[in-house]
Every structure is written in structure tokens, then in C-alpha cells.
């Protein structure tokens, strides 16, 4: 049975359909969310995948790009096997439509190219040598992908990810995943310290694999006090995800958590996070998307050079 909350959220989504419709590159852009971390092994990819599915279950048109700088395996985590990936798009041997997979709950999944992601046009000005270069063509395809979705999620795993640290600003929201481990918290602080200043990006902290809301709140407050004191930065708390054995089981079985164990504590927490992101993120329908904005910045810089 569909809950009253889900019905209400679907109504909210209908109001936000102006975010992005049509196939041209001039329409309203998708809400862009990068899920990142200061270190590996904190569950970033699993969270990005299941967050996309949670949005899909709310009838949100969601696309997930595996932009991990490591070995991208988002497709394998949801039982797919994409032979073609972003690396082939960047090389010009495949179109973005060719490599995009139909994922669970109506989401679209773009398999990653690993370290090749660092060559995406918005991160590599050399990709813009000529108007007909692979960089120009790739970014036009990415802009079209944005225009055809309401929410664009990026698994931005990997320290210093260019989507997160671009000096011109990146996605609308950056969700920084951390765990209670001291090394994870230290890496989260280092990530915040390295973020570009004065950009219109909302930074949110998500505490993963934690035993309770109280513990998550304590960890967040500790991190917040440090960033306030030394960085004059105040990230908000996105929420917390409990330590749940179902997460590892789902990964081993190559089935997303929200499909295999939708009523598990971690799955419910991710669904609630998706709901909050929709409620709490007003969008300017005239604002350009992340790819369109950074593409324009880089091309203008080249024209002025």
C-alpha cells in the first residue's frame, strides 16, 4: 500500500517537474547531488545508488552517474553489467545514450570510467581544444541528460573529486559521507577544508554505520564545532544511516538494498533522506545545471584566452 507520505511527496514532485523536461539543452536543469567522502570504504556508492532508487520510487526522474575515481561498480551493485561506460563516451567511441542503463525503479545508470572520470570536460580544459572536440560533444550529451531528469546524482567517491572541488562550484548539493571512525571524521574535516569557498553549493553531512540518532548528532556537533572554529564553515546534517547487516548482504547479492530489504533500518533511513532532500531544496527553474554552468564557464574562459 502506498503511504500518505509517498502520495504527498509525489504531489510535491509534480510541482517540481519544471526542473527539467524535454531534450534541448536550454530548459530548466535537474537538481544535482554529489555523494562523496574523504576516504574510501564508508559506503558512498551504496548510498548514492539507493538514494537514486528511493527517488525513483517517488516517481522522480533520477539519473545516477558513476563518477567514482576508483573502479566504478554501480552497475554491478544493481545486477547490471554495462560493458560500455563513460570511458568510451570520453573517447568518442560510444554515445552517452549507448552506455546508459535502465536501472531499478525507473532510474537511469551511467557506468563509470574510473580514473578516466577526471578527464570529463568540466575538469579538463584541454578537452575544449576545438568546438568539434570530444569534450564539447561529451558535455552536450551530459547537458541533455540533465534536461531529461528531475534529479542528477553523482557517485563522486574519491578524495579531491573534481565534481566537488571545481573552483567554479559544482553540484547544488554535496553530501559528505562519514562514519564514527576517527580516521573517517578526520578525512571529512580535511575534505571540508579543501572545498572552494564562496560557491553556491549546499554542503551536508551524512553519518553512516552509526548506532543511534544521538550518536550521529554528537559526531555531527563535534565536526560542526571544529569547522566553525577553524574554517568558518557550517555544513548541515543530512541525517544518519544505522549500521545494518542487510547492506552488506545486498551488496554481495548484487541487489540494491531498497529492492532486497526495503523495510530494513538502513533502507528506511535512505528513503527518509530522499524525502527530506525534495522537501528542503527549493529550485530556481531558470538556474543552469551543473554541466551546463561549468561548460559555459570553461568555454568562455577559452574564448577570452
What are these regions (language model features)?
Residues 1-21, 202-204, 208-305:
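C-terminal lobe/tail of nucleotide-utilizing enzymes
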Residues 15-17, 90-93, 134-136, 153-158:
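Short gly/ser/thr-rich secondary-structure transition/capping motifs
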Residues 25-70, 74:
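Walker A/P-loop phosphate-binding motif and the immediately C-terminal alpha-helix
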Residues 37, 66, 111-114, 156, ...:
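Flexible glycine-/small-residue-rich
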Residues 64-147, 246-256:
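P-loop/Walker-type NTP enzyme "switch/lid" segment
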Residues 79-84, 194-195, 221-224, 257:
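Short, hinge-like loop/turn segments at secondary-structure boundaries
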Residues 137, 151-243, 249:
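Conserved catalytic-core segment of NTP-binding enzymes
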Amino acid at each position: 500500500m502506498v503511504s500518505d507520505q509517498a502520495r504527498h511527496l509525489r504531489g510535491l514532485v509534480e510541482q517540481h517537474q519544471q526542473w527539467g523536461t524535454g531534450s534541448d539543452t536550454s530548459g530548466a536543469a535537474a537538481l544535482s547531488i554529489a555523494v562523496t567522502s574523504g576516504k574510501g570504504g564508508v559506503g558512498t556508492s551504496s548510498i548514492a545508488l539507493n538514494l537514486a532508487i528511493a527517488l525513483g520510487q517517488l516517481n522522480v526522474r533520477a539519473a545516477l552517474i558513476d563518477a567514482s575515481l576508483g573502479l566504478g561498480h554501480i552497475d554491478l551493485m544493481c545486477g547490471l553489467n554495462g560493458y560500455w561506460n563513460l570511458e568510451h563516451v570520453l573517447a568518442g567511441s560510444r554515445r552517452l545514450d549507448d552506455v546508459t542503463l535502465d536501472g531499478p525503479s525507473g532510474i537511469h545508470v551511467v557506468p563509470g570510467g574510473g580514473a578516466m572520470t577526471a578527464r570529463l570536460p568540466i575538469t579538463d580544459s584541454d578537452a575544449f581544444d576545438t568546438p568539434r572536440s570530444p569534450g564539447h560533444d561529451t558535455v552536450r550529451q551530459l547537458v541533455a541528460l540533465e534536461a531529461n531528469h528531475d534529479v542528477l546524482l553523482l557517485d563522486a567517491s574519491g578524495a579531491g573529486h573534481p565534481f566537488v572541488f571545481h573552483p567554479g562550484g559544482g553540484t547544488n548539493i554535496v553530501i559528505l559521507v562519514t562514519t564514527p571512525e576517527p580516521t573517517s571524521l578526520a578525512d571529512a574535516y580535511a575534505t571540508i577544508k579543501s572545498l572552494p569557498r564562496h560557491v553556491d553549493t549546499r554542503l551536508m553531512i551524512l553519518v553512516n554505520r552509526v548506532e543511534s540518532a544521538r550518536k550521529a548528532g554528537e559526531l555531527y556537533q563535534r565536526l560542526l564545532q571544529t569547522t566553525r572554529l577553524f574554517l568558518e564553515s557550517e555544513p548541515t546534517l543530512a541525517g544518519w544511516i544505522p549500521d545494518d547487516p542487510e547492506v552488506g548482504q545486498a551488496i554481495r547479492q548484487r541487489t540494491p538494498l531498497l529492492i532486497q530489504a526495503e523495510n530494513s533500518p538502513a533502507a528506511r533511513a535512505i528513503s527518509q533522506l530522499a524525502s527530506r532532500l525534495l522537501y528542503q531544496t527549493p529550485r530556481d527553474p531558470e538556474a543552469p545545471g551543473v554541466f551546463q554552468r561549468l561548460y559555459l564557464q570553461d568555454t568562455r574562459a577559452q574564448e577570452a584566452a
